[in-house]
Curated annotation (Swiss-Prot):
Reaction it catalyzes: N-(5-phospho-beta-D-ribosyl)anthranilate + diphosphate = 5-phospho-alpha-D-ribose 1-diphosphate + anthranilate
GO molecular function: anthranilate phosphoribosyltransferase activity; magnesium ion binding
Similarity-based family: Belongs to the anthranilate phosphoribosyltransferase family.
HAMAP family: TrpD (MF_00211)
Binding site residues for anthranilate 2: 169
InterPro entries linked: Anthranilate_Pribosyl_Tfrase, Glycosyl_Trfase_fam3, Glycosyl_Trfase_fam3_N_dom, Glycosyl_Trfase_fam3_N_dom_sf, Nuc_phospho_transferase
Source organism of the structure: Paraburkholderia phymatum (strain DSM 17167 / CIP 108236 / LMG 21445 / STM815) (Burkholderia phymatum)
Binding site for Mg(2+) 2: 228-229
Protein's recorded name: Anthranilate phosphoribosyltransferase
Family matches, as Gene3D superfamilies: Nucleoside phosphorylase/phosphoribosyltransferase catalytic domain, Transferase, Pyrimidine Nucleoside Phosphorylase, Chain C
Length: 342
């Protein structure tokens, strides 16, 4: 089998690491059997040569192997709403707000997230600010999804093996393959996904990785203004996997009768500010926050196969917000998760 030194040499020569070799190297890293120096060198080398679809697929396969899984029996209309983060836009937690709206409209949502790394407020931070207990065991998350239609998986609880590479990632301080693996390794194995990415090149890459990993209906999105969400401020690049086929296209707010507006007003300094915007959107307060959540929830409902199109999803999302159902989902998740407080 390939040695870490051989793998490093290969990245230096800009040559690909093959599937079985990548599986082997990732297992060494996840088990803590590779020295921090070699692990740092290899993940940096991969970034410099640019990770291939095959390398990312193999790495995601191993991360899934090492994860603590959430077993959800019925996976119809089951969707993961996630962003790679790292888009540097510092907006409020649009994907977290999207989770509540999507669940209110009939999807089951497994949200996989963490505390803010590059953002001022990660999904875990804003959920805690809302009063949600994010520290659940896998079977409690499964119960949460079954009962409320929503489950939040706090990444450190589900990827314990990541602690072996965490110090290396922290010290390097640059983006590595691990930044794009998070969205590919949902511990509940949701077959459908709305995935936001921080770079246009990742749209085509991530949708093909999800195809290889056996996903059902995936929309990978990149807002041309740099957002890892469906954007109101620019066109959004979409890579869609459906029935095994991939199509790539662009969507615009105007396609759905929405106005193009800058995302500037969506910027927040911390989780408390993010909570305010999130609740304003769910309380049906007219404004950019409500519109961008509606647009993203419409897209998520389409990927969850609750809606027949994004336009149909937007209609359902508007209903879920206007009826007060989306706002009620926040209290429901708070109540359900608080019963597990130790």
């Amino acid at each position: 089998m390939i040695t870490p030194q051989e793998a490093l040499q290969r990245t230096i020569e800009h040559r690909e690491i093959f599937h079985d070799e990548m599986l082997h190297l990732m297992r060494l890293i996840m088990r803590g059997d590779m020295s921090p120096v070699m692990a740092a060198a290899i993940i940096t080398g991969l970034r410099v040569k640019k990770e291939t679809i095959g390398e990312i697929t193999a790495a995601a396969t191993v991360m899934r192997e090492f994860a603590r899984h959430v077993d959800v029996q019925d996976n119809s209309n089951f969707v993961d709403i996630v962003g790679t983060g790292g888009d540097g836009s510092h907006t409020f937690n649009i994907s977290t707000a999207t989770m509540f709206v999507s669940a209110a409209a009939g999807a089951k949502v497994a949200k996989h997230g963490n505390r803010g790394v590059s953002s001022k407020s990660g999904s875990a931070d804003v959920l805690e600010a809302l009063g949600v207990n994010i520290d659940l065991q896998p079977e409690q998350v499964a119960a949460s999804i079954t009962e409320t239609g929503m489950g939040f998986m706090f990444a450190p609880n589900h990827h314990p093996a990541m602690k072996n590479i965490a110090p290396v990632r922290r010290e390097l301080g640059v983006r590595t393959i691990f930044n794009i693996l998070g969205p590919l390794t949902n511990p509940a194995g949701a077959p459908n996904q709305l995935q936001g990415v921080f770079h246009p090149d990742l749209v085509g890459i991530q949708v093909r990785v999800m195809q290889r990993l056996g996903a059902r209906h995936v929309l990978v999105v990149y807002g041309r203004d740099g957002m890892d969400e469906v954007s109101l401020g620019a066109a959004t690049l979409v890579g869609e996997l459906r029935n095994g086929e991939i199509t790539e296209y662009e969507i615009h707010p105007e396609d759905f009768g929405m106005q193009m507006v800058s995302n500037r007003t969506l910027k927040v300094a911390d989780a408390a500010e993010s909570k305010v915007l999130l609740l304003e959107a769910l309380d049906n307060k007219p404004g950019v926050a409500r519109e961008i959540v509606t647009l993203n929830a419409g897209t998520a409902l389409y990927s969850a196969n609750v809606a027949e199109s994004i336009a149909d999803g937007i209609r359902l999302a508007r209903e879920a917000i206007a009826s007060g159902k989306a706002r009620a989902k926040v209290d429901e998740l708070v109540r359900f998760t608080q019963q597990f407080k130790h």
